[in-house]
Amino acid sequence: MNSSRSTDTSPAQVRVTGWRVGAQTVSAILAIREASQLGLADAKGLVERVLAGAPIVLNVNNAESAQELVSALDRLKFDAQLVSH
């Protein structure tokens, strides 16, 4: 018998398109590392790309983690949204 759960465990994506005055870059790097399992250098490089004006797309483990990352990045003054499939 299959047990159905309401949490989506399929991979999800987050698009980060920009930043606002007061952006907390170090905290954003840490949040991205935690959600995406990237290393420090990779996460730092992605944040630097956003700061330079290039949007990025991050792969995360599931929709819940993706939503948490979007919320965290918003608090850190980065513009992010879930990528719909």
Spell out what each predicted region is.
Residues M1-H85:
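Short, amphipathic alpha-helical interaction segments embedded in low-complexity terminal/linker regions
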